[in-house]
Amino acid sequence: PAPNYTLYYFNGRGRAEILRMLFAAAGQKFNDKXXEFN
C-alpha cells in the first residue's frame, strides 16, 4: 500500500503549489491542509 501524505502549509503566495503539482504528476493522492495567518 502507498503511504498517505499530508501537505501542511500557510496560505499565501502559492508556495505549496509546486508540491501539489509534483504529487499530481506522480499520481499520488494527498491531503491538502492550509492554515491561515492570524
Curated annotation (Swiss-Prot):
Keywords: Eye lens protein. The keyword Ligase does not apply. Gene3D superfamilies: 1.20.1050.130. The keyword Transcription regulation does not apply. S-crystallins are structural components of squids and octopi eye lens. Contains relatively little if any GST activity. Disulfide bonds: none annotated. SUPFAM superfamilies: Thioredoxin-like. GO terms for molecular function: structural constituent of eye lens. This is S-crystallin 3. Residues 3-38 form the GST N-terminal domain. It comes from Nototodarus gouldi (Gould's flying squid). It comes from the Eukaryota. InterPro entries: Glutathione_S-Trfase_N, Thioredoxin-like_sf.
